[in-house]
């Protein structure tokens, strides 16, 4: 082999491999690895690709249901929505690159998740995102918000897919590690799904798409280590995206799939050519021989190490039917994309890489992929926090001033400044735009619609990982239900700190147990996902943030509900039990200055029972508007319904049994607001009593103000001005 760097303990450590892992490599291959082999092991055995700290716990997630076609383990999950149609979806993180280079980090995050979806044979129809930024007063936050939002919009808008929903939060725990979680949803024929497992010996392995450069080398390894003060120096490991090349790649891939050319397909994402080739071979129980002399490159003098670890974007690897090779090549040439046979499948179960006539790597393929190291790391449960009793919390201001303050806080204010930079209506199928409970996207050429949402409440997960995990799933389920959707499945993006710290691993394990329990109780299986660990800087971890992306089905998209009040004189009903739970509420944090206490418990049986009733009301046309209750509680939800319509409401006073500020701002779970015509109110209330569903009339729509009996009132227009002003003002340079 060629002269390569000497393998030293320092070089091994620089590749993110622990001494015991390197010893395992020596035992596995019976010799010292080459430099290229060391890079391959580093890429395949890092946390980002191998899931070595999380795999043992992920096995407990419920992943099956009659409508699940493909669960975790492929590029994306697939569910059956009837009529021969399937929805393909996944969520993935691009956290570390987005902190270092926010625009490019965000663009390539979107590009990567779109490829995961169309690799399965689906045409992307929607994107969503979940963004977590540091405290507004942190000197980098404005720059990061601006770059990430521009990157998401720049890629999605140019590629031609609508960005229809998401979630954005600010907290000081994300100062040194922001989170950029991107979700993509696509539509495919249920009987034409494409998979990654190669089959057949001596089948051509074809490189497709853009040329390989030096960008992104060790991007996956960077995503498997915590940051320190030198993180800015990692800028060269951030990939550069080209949405127009990705659009060409999409069309070319779908065309050769339709021409029945493809045996297996894998996008080149994390760890690039290494990961895609290893996964295809390992999943198919085959070996892979690659000749790097055939790889299209855009830079001269690239080494085998660089080509194997490059994360240049807009690239695919396929195993083609030999008799279809010329037809496939003609299709890709037509789209102006590179097409090169770079290797063949073999029966050897070995991964062999050649360059310039030399063998640069010769490794057992299964041990690189399926049989990477697996850890059951020590973990300790988070200590239980005390329940905060509402009567012990002094209200620092009256109810209406507190509402005005809350809707102008970073977490609860309008995110219009963000979503107006995204094209959310391209393709012409967006039924409900951002700003409601869930986006609704029409399934083209039919009456069906998809309800899409992304949810998590990190402060709950920090306070009680188990309840926080349950709540993240329950809120996604509620948001889909609140637009009239039938929740079908989720994708998760599990963002946590350093798993080598037992308390962080305890958060991960606790959240995962909560997610599993909620998914089982709500019949809401996990079909895809991503784990992002080491989200720490100088030992300070992010809040545990298990983002949940939910997908639901509407049989008739024209019957979806929205949050806006529809007309004056309708009854406002509060469905679900209200106790006035203030622990970990936004009110307690942002009005009272206390970030403490146990979060609200999640009663999954109540979630199911109450949600099914609300969905039935929407389908029957009884509910004219619907909104789930979450951050900010009852009065914030009422304000959102009023601001969405311009119609006010006359509200009854808080019941004597609940402290007023806890009634209006508590965050009890399993609750919805619905409006019904006055003529239906009595019948609905009686029906709810008969079904053992808590339901109370709390007011009537009408006027131009929110008016609470015995309290002050506030004009809806005044609320809207405050609601819409904070984020544009902040991004324009106003003090945080």
Swiss-Prot record:
The active site is at 48, 94 (proton acceptor). It catalyses: N(2)-formyl-N(1)-(5-phospho-beta-D-ribosyl)glycinamide + L-glutamine + ATP + H2O = 2-formamido-N(1)-(5-O-phospho-beta-D-ribosyl)acetamidine + L-glutamate + ADP + phosphate + H(+). Mg(2+) 2 binds at residues 116, 267. GO terms for molecular function: ATP binding; magnesium ion binding; phosphoribosylformylglycinamidine synthase activity. GO terms for biological process: 'de novo' IMP biosynthetic process. SUPFAM superfamilies: PurM C-terminal domain-like, PurM N-terminal domain-like. GO terms for cellular component: cytoplasm. InterPro entries: PRibForGlyAmidine_synth_PurL, PurL_linker, PurM-like_C_dom, PurM-like_C_sf, PurM-like_N, PurM-like_N_sf. Mg(2+) 1 binds at residues 92, 530. Substrate binds at residues 93-96, 115, 239, 311-313, 532. Pfam families: AIRS, AIRS_C, FGAR-AT_linker. Pathway: Purine metabolism; IMP biosynthesis via de novo pathway; 5-amino-1-(5-phospho-D-ribosyl)imidazole from N(2)-formyl-N(1)-(5-phospho-D-ribosyl)glycinamide: step 1/2. Keywords: ATP-binding, Cytoplasm, Ligase, Magnesium, Metal-binding, Nucleotide-binding, Purine biosynthesis. ATP binds at residues 51, 90, 492, 529. It is found in: Cytoplasm. Its EC number is 6.3.5.3. Monomer. Part of the FGAM synthase complex composed of 1 PurL, 1 PurQ and 2 PurS subunits. NCBIfam families: FGAM_synth_II, PRK01213.1. Belongs to the FGAMS family. Part of the phosphoribosylformylglycinamidine synthase complex involved in the purines biosynthetic pathway. Catalyzes the ATP-dependent conversion of formylglycinamide ribonucleotide (FGAR) and glutamine to yield formylglycinamidine ribonucleotide (FGAM) and glutamate. The FGAM synthase complex is composed of three subunits. PurQ produces an ammonia molecule by converting glutamine to glutamate. PurL transfers the ammonia molecule to FGAR to form FGAM in an ATP-dependent manner. This is Phosphoribosylformylglycinamidine synthase subunit PurL. The gene is purL.
